[in-house]
Amino acid sequence: MVSQEIISDFEGAFGIKLPKLYIKLITKHNAPGIIQSYFDYYDSYRNEDEYSSFGFEGFETESNKHEPPENIFSQYLYDDDIYGYEHVYSFGRSGCGDFVCFDYRDNPKGSEPKICLVIHDEYDEETGKHLLFPVAENFEAFLDMLYDFDERYPNGYE
């Protein structure tokens, strides 16, 4: 479990409001493992549909301080002035190490940010920043689009 105090500390540290549904989930299940852990997105750089796996980052708490999950307070994108993005905060990672993020760029003071995927090792030729692809309009839409890879592709990806 993650306390409201820890959530408030995170929001205060970055000056954001997390989505209510995310708070509801994370206060009950810190860094939850999920079966339906895949999502689709459009790679506008290559002009093709892609998919990715996903796992939540978590918060260090008293109950996991000796084996904490990937710590959500480590905001590599927000803190990276050269390759990162202002108002983009990761809350999960893909199996390839890419960042699944809350994207507040359209509304930095809002509480229902878009969801995006930031590729950790590929860069936009024009800006030099990490590639960033939109995924969902908000956290609820993101959860709704998650699927189990084996159910969708029983014979593997073809």
What role is predicted for each listed range?
Residues 94, 102-107:
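Short beta-strand micro-motifs enriched in acidic
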Residues 1-98, 154-158:
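A surface-exposed partner-binding patch
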Residues 108-126:
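Intrinsically disordered, low-complexity regulatory segments enriched in Ser/Thr/Pro
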Residues 128-158:
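Acidic, proline/glycine-rich low-complexity IDRs
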Residues 89, 98-102, 113, 118-119:
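Beta-strand-rich cores of mature extracytoplasmic or soluble domains
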Residues 97-100, 122-130:
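Short, surface-exposed beta-strand/loop "edge" segments at domain boundaries and coil↔beta transitions
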